[in-house]
Amino acid sequence: ADLDAAFAGDLLNQCIGSSFSLRNRGVPTLGLYGACSTMAESLLLAAMSISGGFARTALAMTSSHFASSERQYRFPLGYGGQRTPTSQWTVTGAGAVLLGGGERGIRITAATIGSIVDRGICDANNMGAAMAPAAFATLHAHFDDLHCAPEDYDVIITGDLGRLGSEILHGLLEKDGIRADVQDCGVMIFDTRRQDVHCGGSGCGCSASVLCGPLLSRMERGELRRLLFCGTGALLSPLSTQQGESIPAVCHAVVLERS
């Protein structure tokens, strides 16, 4: 393989989706688990490895699958359990970005690694509320550390807060005096008027599909020059939920620029 490293993760136990997809490729692989923040996490780690001179090319990739996630985190589909209004629909999708050391094209120019944030949300069917404070904390840290503002970006993308989580994030930003037009992959990926997905999409493959599909295509066409991609992850497990534990969350932010 021509790849020096692959950074990959997914939602299945022990990240078997990623390891199975790479097991016959001969690629040096680092497995990740950041839940729905995995695409952003893999991007920033791949960029760091190249920037530090440890790799010439690196792959950032992730995936998710609706039925397997339902079975693992909630109920098997055959059970017929009723979904709550705050729940989100795990996207069956995947995304992969190949990074190199070139000077032209779309580049990763900065990143903010998020801290774990836990505001006491215990409902596994309300991940947007658990993740929104983490998104706020990372955005606040990003603007503060890099001395930048929301208007410095053509678009700010989160993934995947869903409708409720997005409303909470906008409220937190407004309360802090930050005016930002933040769009969410979980809201963008489905047509909620025609598809009953409750609060929208979720899963590693949700933000990965939106980023690697329409967003990077818009950057390549010159419609977007500077994009802030904020991957949010609810770091729960089935066991922690069953034991009544609250849901820790994290958000990593990556700046993509078209030269």
What function would you assign to each model-found segment?
Residues 1-34, 152-167:
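Conserved beta-ketoacyl condensing-enzyme motif
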Residues 8-9, 58-64, 99, 227-232:
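Short beta-strand segments
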Residues 9-25, 64-75, 103-113, 174-192:
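Acidic-glycine-rich active-site phosphate/pyrophosphate-binding loop
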Residues 17-19, 44, 69-74, 121, ...:
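Short acidic, glycine/serine/threonine-rich loops at helix termini
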